[in-house]
Swiss-Prot record:
Gene: rplC
PROSITE patterns: RIBOSOMAL_L3 (PS00474)
Keyword entries, A-Z: Ribonucleoprotein, Ribosomal protein, RNA-binding, rRNA-binding
Pfam families: Ribosomal_L3 (PF00297)
Name of the protein: Large ribosomal subunit protein uL3
Organism: Tropheryma whipplei (strain Twist)
Length: 210
């Protein structure tokens, strides 16, 4: 099973790695704790629920307070489920990873609001001239005529863009800064600054050529 850690995105910077400058995303990581173990017999599937982040107890609602009290833990800010192994109450941090390994990062992308087909689906658009009149950014036809007399499900149209779960595969873990509780991951990571992200072992495991 893949090892996984829950942290928060800090932002992007760049560091020197050998003779080249590497763009990295800093992810703040504090101690993670297993707050629940999902079992097939009771829940129908097998997962670990991990939690992290400090939160003012006055801001925790009663159901969540009861959930953590049942596990014998103080409330945490973020909760996520991961496909990993462990026992209730287990604590772990950045030490589960090694510098240079490949990881997958899961986060929620920034919301862009209602967007047209050119921005949302990279449609080409309509010609700027040659008789085109106020159709420049329209999607064009969305289906045939009397057959089938409907628009097929899944047809790409305008709609809300972003604010969805995104996984970026095979990013290199450049540096582990245990003193400051930071993981530096090469490249961009989904989400805005302060949003929770899951860092896990790369499931595809493609070797990286340095």
């Amino acid at each position: 099973m893949a090892r996984a850690l829950l942290g928060t995105k800090v932002g992007m910077t760049q560091i020197w790695s050998g003779r080249r400058v590497v763009p990295v995303t800093a992810v703040a990581v504090t101690t993670n704790v297993v707050s629940q173990v999902k079992a097939p017999e009771k829940d129908g599937y097998s997962r670990l629920q991990i939690a992290t982040g400090a939160i003012d107890p006055r801001r925790v609602n009663r159901p969540r307070k009861g959930h953590f009290a049942k596990a014998g833990l103080t409330p945490r800010r973020f909760i996520r489920e991961v496909d990993s192994e462990g026992s209730l109450g287990d604590e772990f941090g950045p030490e589960i990873f090694q510098e240079g390994q490949l990881v997958d990062v899961v986060g929620k992308s920034k919301g862009k609001g209602f967007s047209g087909t050119m921005k949302r689906h990279n449609f080409q658009g309509v010609s700027a001239t040659h008789g085109s009149h106020r159709n420049h950014r329209k999607p064009g036809s969305v289906g045939a005529s009397s057959t089938p007399s409907r628009v097929f499900k899944g047809t790409r149209m305008a709609g809300r863009l972003g604010s969805s779960r995104v996984t970026v595969h095979n990013l290199r873990l450049v540096k582990i800064d245990s003193e400051n509780g930071l993981l530096l991951v090469e490249g961009a990571v989904p989400g805005s600054s302060g949003s929770p992200v899951i860092i896990r072992d790369a499931v595809k495991g493609v070797p990286i050529v340095s």
